[in-house]
Amino acid sequence: MFKICLWYILKKEHILHKTISRYSETFNCSAFPAHITIEHSLNHQEAHDMRGGDIETYNFYPCGNPIQTTTKFGSDTFYAIEQPLKVLDKVGIYHISLAYRMNKEFQAFELAVIGRIEPILKEDLEICVADCHGEVKDWKVLYK
């Protein structure tokens, strides 16, 4: 789907990993590593080059309520519940996804279940390259 991605991945012990797992059970969808996407739809070389570059790490602050977004892949529709994030007083550049589903829209009552998240501090983040070619359940970190 999203080919090779460059992520800020939350450290293993961060509570958002458990939160995303809980939402995946509640909404009957696949769990995935808690992450903030830096870039997606890269090839291996592009991701490797970017990973080796100078990527700044920030503190991220939740801004507003979670929203549903859609991305079309041919005849399929990818739905995501995303929490917009603010960084350096800028909104709309980054988000953290809390749930994903294919071809089944999230309903208003499902969005209402999503709780507020705490700020994500830069010391809780690592930069990694992830393989996001297939279904969400198959996404995996290639290297940090």
What are the functions of these language-model segments?
Residues 1-144:
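Histidine-dependent nucleotide/RNA phosphoesterase domain, centered on the 2H-phosphoesterase fold
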